[in-house]
Regions:
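Class II aminoacyl-tRNA synthetase-like tRNA-binding/catalytic domains
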Residues: 1-78, 247, 251, 332
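Active-site lining segments that contact anionic ligands and/or coordinate catalytic metals
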Residues: 24, 45-47, 68-70, 238-240, ...
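A residue-level signal for conserved active-site and pocket-lining positions in enzyme catalytic cores
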Residues: 29, 73, 131, 243, ...
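A glycine-rich, aromatic-flanked flexible loop/lid motif
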Residues: 59-67, 259-269, 285
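Solvent-exposed residues in well-ordered beta-strands and their adjoining turns
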Residues: 74-78, 92, 273
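Catalytic palm subdomain of template-directed nucleic-acid polymerases
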Residues: 76-86
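Active-site pocket scaffolds in enzymes
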Residues: 273, 281-355
Length: 355
């Protein structure tokens, strides 16, 4: 289905909305087609939307765009665990098809296909509590400790920086000294250029790892994961991981509470490996009108614009769930791109409106 791009209400929160005038009324560029997808799923059973979404986030990270495309399935008679099964099957099918049909393109991009072939393995599923324990180094994963791994990675990076700098200096000195044939000069210069690119990445890691360590050690239970936290977690896995059952305060108002422990919302985030972080967000939707009204008030959202959404519960609802997959983030991970803006011809992100 096609969800509207103009909307009178927020889907994810009011702090990152692009507001515009709609014939004298305030309107917003859509953050998600999900709420409309829920309405259609009640009639059709299983639906999906695919369209542009907009977030006014003043972020300059390599993961953020202000305008991007999302695929958003919504399924009636579906709970969080069936939703996670669907997400896993969907991602696996997409990645395996790319590997099968685009091997030459991946080779041109320098993508190590073996890093993608692990998609055939079952995705690890962690509760928020488990993920926090792993992040802070209180729980190991297959004998690996997040803090110790980072500390060792930092030592390895520093040693490699020393080696690369020494080799670059040696090759540059040999070229300057003369006596080399043209082919030898070209070979060494190409090697130097390659090593300088490697050195750039190594020095970035040298700057980042101490920050990741501090963020992991200082992480406060109950907070959402930031980019550095997602990076630390995913360094211990070679496949996307699913983190579910989040503190309800940090999830959207429409997330269903865990009936066995109402402190948690039945949301799930899928974090891609190799530092790419969240590529899918989803969960089971709240079917209780009473809970929804409470959450709308808690999030300080205008009740009047959500009456149509509350009507979906007043006049009969069923368990349902869904997710949103950010297309550009998925492409960035599959192709191992440095920045999500490389995935789209004319990117829109904080500070860029042209061309």
């Amino acid at each position: 289905m096609d969800a509207p791009i103009f909307t009178g209400n927020a889907a994810e929160g009011t702090t990152d909305l692009f507001e515009t005038d709609y014939y004298g009324q305030p309107a917003y560029l859509t953050q998600s087609g999900q709420l409309y997808g829920e309405a259609m799923a009640m009639a059709m059973g299983k639906i999906y939307t695919f369209g542009p979404t907009f977030r006014a986030e003043k972020s300059k990270t390599r993961r953020h765009l202000s305008e991007f495309w999302m695929i958003e399935p919504e399924m009636a008679f579906c709970d969080i665990f069936e939703n996670m099964d669907t997400i896993e099957a969907f991602l696996r099918a997409v990645v395996l098809e790319v590997i099968e049909k685009c091997p030459e393109e991946l080779e041109v991009l320098g993508r190590d296909i073996s890093k993608l072939q692990t998609i055939s393995k079952t995705f690890p599923r962690l509760s928020y509590d488990e993920a926090v324990e792993i992040l802070k180094g209180h729980k190991d994963v297959d004998g690996q400790n997040s803090i110790k791994v980072l500390e060792q990675d930092l030592l390895t990076v520093e040693m490699r920086i020393t080696e690369v700098k020494a080799d670059i200096s040696s090759r540059e000195a040999a070229i300057t000294a003369g006596g080399m044939k043209k082919g030898e000069i070209n070979f060494n210069q190409n090697k130097i250029d390659s090593q300088k690119q490697e050195l750039k990445q190594l020095e970035e890691d040298q700057r980042n790892i101490p920050n990741w360590l501090k963020s992991a050690r200082d992480f406060v239970y109950g907070n959402d994961f930031g980019g550095s936290d997602e990076t630390v977690l995913t360094r211990l896995f070679d496949n996307p991981i699913m983190v579910y059952d989040w503190p309800h305060e940090i999830k959207a108002f429409y997330m269903k509470r865990n009936p066995e422990d109402p402190r948690f919302a039945r949301g799930v985030d899928v974090l891609a490996p190799e530092g790419y972080g969240e590529i899918v967000g989803g969960g089971e939707r709240e079917t209780s009108e009473e809970w929804l009204v409470e959450k709308i008030k808690e999030h300080k959202l205008p009740m009047d614009v959500f009456q149509w959404y509350l009507d979906l519960r007043r006049y009969g609802s069923v368990p349902h769930a869904g997710f949103g997959l950010g297309l550009e983030r998925l492409v960035a991970w599959v192709c191992k791109l440095d920045h999500v803006r490389e995935t789209i011809p004319f990117p829109r992100y904080y500070g860029r409106l042209e061309p």
